[in-house]
Amino acid sequence: GQLIDIHGGGKDLKFPHHENEVAQSYAVNDHGLANYWMHNGMLNLDGGKMSKSLGNTVWAKDIIAEKGSNVIRWLLLSVRYRDTLNYSDETMKAAETELQKIYTPWKQAIIKSAMANAELGTEVDSEHFEKFMEAMRDDMNTPNAYAEIFEVTKLLNQSLRVREVDWALVGKWVATLDKMLDVLGIVF
């Protein structure tokens, strides 16, 4: 068969499952199965292993119905993909709180600019966006990418809390946040 670009799975499948797939591919095709192998960390529930056999599973569709896709996506991306993630009421609440800290000034910028009849620009701050992308290129280092999102959120907050608002600057921070969040699949 053809070589595929990316093959992924849980890090618990690395040996023997994925190593067997590589061996089988070489035996049949004289080449490996994939250019890149990505092994994700495990998802724990309240500090313990989540498993169908243990009967302690949580369904994504139920979480999305209750909390929305942005919150679960934010939580899932809050750790590096290779690290273990603990799902609990506390971690979900933390994800909601963090997203709200970004959403509130973002929404204020939209509302206040409309009230001031000011148009927000679409220029993205290249320096902050590049720092965000550097983190993403560093083996999807989402914790560092999140730090850059919070830095831009802080700058947006500061630009809204002055007597004479510079709407072009506000627009730049909003556009930068939009572009960063779009990379993560989060849309306000």
Task: Give residue spans per PLM region.
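Alpha-helical recognition segments enriched in aromatics with Gly/Pro capping
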Residues: 1-110
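Feature 926 captures the class I aminoacyl-tRNA synthetase adenylation module centered on the KMSKS loop
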Residues: 28-31, 64-65, 81-188
